Amino acid sequence: MIDRIDGSSHKPGDKMNVIAYGAYDRHNYGDLLFAIVLKHYLEADGRFRVLIAATKQSDLSSYGALPTIALKKALEATRQQDKTMLIVAGGECLTAQWESIIGYLAPQAIYYPIKASPYLIGHRQFIRLSRAFTSIPSDLPLVLGERELPGYQVMYNSVGGNEISRKKPLIHAAIERNLKDCTYVSVRDRETSAELDKLGVEHNLVPDSAVLISDIFPQQPEPSEPGHIVFHISDHHAKRRIEAIARQLTELSASTGLKIALLTIGKAPGHSDDEPLDKLQGLLGERAYRVNSGHIQDIIRCIATSRLYCGTSLHGAITALTYAVPQIALLPRRVVKLSSFLETWVPQQSCGFAEIEQISQTASALLTSFGEPQKAELQAMVELMKNRVRANLEHMTALYEQATTADEPATQSPTGNTTLFAAH
């Protein structure tokens, strides 16, 4: 449990420190976006100073990301505030487990031995060791509760967590316990919402906050550019499928006359894309080219100026969505978080779902049918989604301010705005 210092050093007019916590210390594109969005929007009116916290201190600024401090340091820096808002914002954080989080931070050579450790020494012992190693006061790395964080208001910003009910009883119980022990929960897709309904956890359904990234990094394609098709696949999903993918992409490029941009989106262990995409480049030759810097703005530019995105990355698809580019969820039955998000929020005529053997046919059909009317409809839907995300952020700050001024019980739904928190 984190001890607190009585009293407050806060003075009227001072900025209040807010902690944004997530997996921002590894190169996984989507996680890095959450920190940027929260800092941009929460600091906009001058009331808050956002501390970007993760499992450990890191500096991925060479990739366009925000540096992080360890959560332990962020808690130490905010102890003298009477109340501190701690926002958990990041992807599938509800089901992230210690072996994955610690594995991502380790050298590639020991990633898989770390992943196997809970099965060798037992999950309960591995949790104890992980808590001691990271000083994170929770049995799960990204699911925090207020019982072990007195004086903090823990809130969850449009997070994900599919298949909670299939987790081991020890993990399942920890998720339920901590989510019922926080101020506010919002989730980003119907699958996660259904899982929390089973647990009896009150929550709101809100789009992924990364849809706001186009407000922060506006993009305009050059009129002279013919456009391209973005393709992405993670190493895990590419195994034994490279040749079949190459055949599909060759056919797609030949039929459309468009080149294929093979885009690296993640470089962290467990999220690395370089190896399968390099192999595809070798097979596709002049029909394709690599975009592999890993820099956030290069990734955004590549997707925003494309004609179509096809891949296994959820935040590749969300980036396409927010710039009104049609999306194809690759391997939808395997990448549930991706297919679930698109099914929850995106108009059917603006997205597609494809197994490997369906890539060329699905992409060609979507490119043919996606015209100006469909683009206008998608842009309108994106604006509605952005409004819901902004309302969610405003609701969280309102809950915090209510608690700091009146110490009244917080409620889950924003007064007068409940319609903003239902999927279309």
Pin down the residues of each PLM region.
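Active-site anion-handling motifs in enzyme catalytic cores
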Residues: 2-424
